[in-house]
């Protein structure tokens, strides 16, 4: 989920060309292949003894539980040990990563490092595995003719089923589930669009460029990952540019990495691509006013940003940081404006409620705190809980700065925007691209 800069035949995700491979210690684990294990030959007496032995009955409790299609089996029932697979583990390069943390500025991150324990990693890996299984299924059903409301429902139903938290009981959605509303953005709509109740149905077309951006959390540990799909091959270079730019950002990310260097490198890679549309060659441009971002506990947007264009910031990545490395490339002006409508809402826990007088607003705020906390939510999520006549209360919360509203972000009409995104954990001795999968 992109952070807006302050002050203002079919193509699957894995079909675009890849950048040079990252040096991985442990690539994403694959499903184990079944096969026969051949032993050594034994004597006839051993064979006779074996025949006499009774065959052991299969313990049905130990039978492997497989995921369904669509995915609806909770991961806790598949991973009985409750230990979830590692993602892509990448060694730090010695060029820009100082593993000796000695400066006073970094001491403030000790509490973050102490929290990066086995439980932290397992929650993140759990959320990442949910994301992988859900997205790999929806990639098989994304075709021209599908309604975007149906696609959002498939994603969100899958996430809630696999986390085993439907979010209908008070506080249940805070344990695990959707980290923010599913983003389904077509063509020049870059980010922050989701189907809303009562809106006109949107049907996916052959010539559309669709960005799918959704987040999964387990105990507030948020995995934010996005990909783009297009059916018309004329967009291949656009998707390749953005995917390679994102992978470049992931390659450059690390402890002590300068954000300015990462941003400049991302832009250089992305803007080396061109696309030909309607017999006109158009350069792919890095979007200027939306950024990648760090992720905090229960907060999708932290206090650090990773632009996709050259910047003068002196900020560095630090040990213990969690970043959503994402890039957006456009065939338009590569500058986004707010469109009409509301994508979602987010509660600001630091805002004062002193000026809040409407009883409807107070009641709504209580519901928001109990069910979403600081996680971003949409109107669909409120109505799913049975909340009615909330518009006046929501208007009061937004006006008083207690809840922030997010509008869709768009480039100029007729342009096309693509997005790819992964979440990366900057662990003390390696970085883990937690959302990496076989698809992208």
UniProtKB/Swiss-Prot annotation:
Example GO molecular function: metal ion binding
EC number: 3.4.11.18
UniProt entry keywords in alphabetical sequence: Aminopeptidase, Cytoplasm, Hydrolase, Metal-binding, Protease
Cofactor section: Co(2+); Zn(2+); Mn(2+); Fe(2+)
Enzyme class at the top of the EC tree: hydrolase
Cellular compartments per GO CC: cytoplasm
Chief place of localization: cytoplasm
Ranges for region Disordered: 1-66
Reported function: Cotranslationally removes the N-terminal methionine from nascent proteins. The N-terminal methionine is often cleaved when the second residue in the primary sequence is small and uncharged (Met-Ala-, Cys, Gly, Pro, Ser, Thr, or Val).
Residue ranges, compositional bias (Basic residues): 48-59
Binding site residues for substrate: 192, 301
Catalysed transformations (reactions): Release of N-terminal amino acids, preferentially methionine, from peptides and arylamides
InterPro entries named in the record: Creatinase/aminopeptidase-like, Met_Aminopeptidase_Type2, Pept_M24, Pept_M24_MAP, Pept_M24A_MAP2, Pept_M24A_MAP2_BS, WH-like_DNA-bd_sf, WH_DNA-bd_sf
Residues engaged in binding a divalent metal cation 2: 224, 293, 326, 421
Cofactor-binding details, from the entry: Binds 2 divalent metal cations per subunit. Has a high-affinity and a low affinity metal-binding site. The true nature of the physiological cofactor is under debate. The enzyme is active with cobalt, zinc, manganese or divalent iron ions. Most likely, methionine aminopeptidases function as mononuclear Fe(2+)-metalloproteases under physiological conditions, and the catalytically relevant metal-binding site has been assigned to the histidine-containing high-affinity site.
GO biological process, one term: proteolysis
Residues the record lists as binding a divalent metal cation 1: 213, 224, 421
Originating organism: Ajellomyces capsulatus (strain H143) (Darling's disease fungus)
Keyword hit for Hydrolase: yes
Subcellular location: Cytoplasm
Similarity comment text for this entry: Belongs to the peptidase M24A family. Methionine aminopeptidase eukaryotic type 2 subfamily.
Protein name per the record: Methionine aminopeptidase 2
């Amino acid at each position: 989920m992109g952070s807006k800069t302050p002050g203002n035949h079919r193509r699957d995700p894995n079909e675009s060309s890849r950048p040079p491979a990252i040096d991985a210690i442990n690539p994403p684990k694959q499903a184990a292949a079944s096969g026969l294990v051949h032993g050594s030959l034994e004597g006839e007496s051993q064979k006779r003894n074996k025949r006499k032995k009774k065959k052991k009955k299969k313990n049905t409790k130990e039978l492997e539980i497989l995921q369904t299609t669509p995915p609806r089996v909770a991961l806790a029932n598949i991973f009985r040990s409750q230990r979830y697979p590692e993602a892509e583990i990448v060694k730090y390069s010695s060029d820009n990563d100082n593993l000796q943390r000695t400066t006073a500025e970094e001491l403030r991150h000790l509490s973050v490092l102490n929290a990066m324990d086995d439980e932290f990693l397992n929650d993140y890996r759990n959320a990442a595995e949910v994301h992988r299984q859900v997205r790999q299924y929806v990639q098989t059903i994304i075709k021209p003719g599908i309604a975007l409301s149906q696609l959002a429902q498939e994603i969100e139903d899958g996430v809630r089923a696999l986390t085993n938290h439907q979010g209908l009981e008070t506080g249940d959605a805070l344990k695990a589930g959707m980290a923010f509303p599913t983003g389904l953005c077509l063509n020049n709509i870059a980010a922050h669009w989701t189907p809303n109740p009562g809106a006109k149905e949107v049907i996916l077309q052959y010539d559309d460029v669709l960005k799918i951006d959704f987040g999964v959390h387990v105990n507030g540990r948020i995995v934010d990952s996005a990909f783009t799909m297009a059916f018309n091959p004329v967009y291949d270079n656009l998707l390749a540019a953005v995917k390679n730019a994102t992978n470049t950002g992931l390659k450059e990310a690390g402890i002590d990495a300068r954000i300015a260097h990462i941003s400049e490198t991302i832009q250089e890679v992305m803007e080396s691509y061109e696309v030909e549309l309607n017999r006109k060659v158009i350069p792919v441009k890095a979007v200027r006013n939306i950024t990648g971002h760090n992720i905090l506990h229960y907060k999708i947007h932290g206090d650090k940003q990773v632009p996709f264009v050259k910047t003068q910031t002196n900020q560095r990545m630090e040990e213990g940081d969690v970043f959503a490395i994402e890039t957006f490339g456009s065939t338009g002006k590569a500058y986004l404006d707010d469109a009409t409508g509301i994508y979602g809402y987010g509660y600001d826990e630091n805002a004062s409620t002193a000026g809040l007088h409407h009883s409807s607003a107070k009641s709504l705020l209580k519901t928001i705190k109990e069910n979403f906390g600081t996680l971003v939510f949409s109107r669909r999520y409120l109505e799913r809980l049975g909340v009615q006549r909330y518009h006046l209360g929501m208007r009061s919360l937004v006006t008083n700065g207690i809840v922030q509203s997010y509008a869709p972000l768009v480039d100029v009409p007729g342009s096309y925007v693509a997005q790819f995104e992964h979440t990366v954990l900057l662990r003390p001795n390696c970085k883990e691209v937690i959302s990496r999968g076989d698809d992208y």
